Amino acid sequence: MLRRWALRQYGVSDAAVIMAVAFGVSALLGIVRQTMFGATFGDGAAAAAYYAAARLPETFISFVAGGAFTAALVPLLLAQADEAQQQHLFHVVLTTVGVAVAVLSLIGIIMCEWFVVTILLPGIDANTQQLTISVSRLLFVQPLLLALVSILSAALTAHKRFSLIAVAYIVHNPTIILGVWVAQQWPVLSIYAPAAGLVLAAAAKLVFVSMGIRGLNWRARWVWQPHLPQLHQVLWLAIMSAHHFVLQ
């Protein structure tokens, strides 16, 4: 029964209801998350380091996984002549974007010390700077996971499978809540626990949408074809969409 629900196809109106419910549940859990976070860390150095550390990875995520690739890829998947061509485009985009985001994330990990010390927190004490750098490096695992989630979600959207996309959206806050709870139980973990919760949230999202992809009988494959014209269309549309999302 759960499998049937997870793989069911929905029309536009039903999909809108499902996603609206997911947004509502996530918003309520977000209130719980913020309340617990504030009660645990207040406005001290750990909280300041957490929010500062998230700034650079979140800016990157806005470009690579803020819905831009989903919005760009769905119409091009639907425009393909058959499912074989859909899968080919899907694999090319997955491979190319995965490699590009992995490389950029690695650069972010290497450069974040310079960014924090020189631009983000130049006048803050060394301990807070170091905590911010360490947490930022941990959070740079997110962009690759969320970029893959965005691409897999596009394939599910093109096939009108919204259930697992909604579940993936909901799991974001519970994992962070779990991280805050862990920090309460083991204070030595401090702000690293909710930061790990953020990474766990991205991993959980990837697990759920991957289940949906398996339900389509699609399998992730390495297909390196950077000169494919449809790939260039996806990347251009994604850049335009990301620019719009970031400006909002």
Task: List PLM regions with ranges.
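Membrane-embedded alpha-helical bundles of multi-pass transporters/translocases
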Residues: 1-248
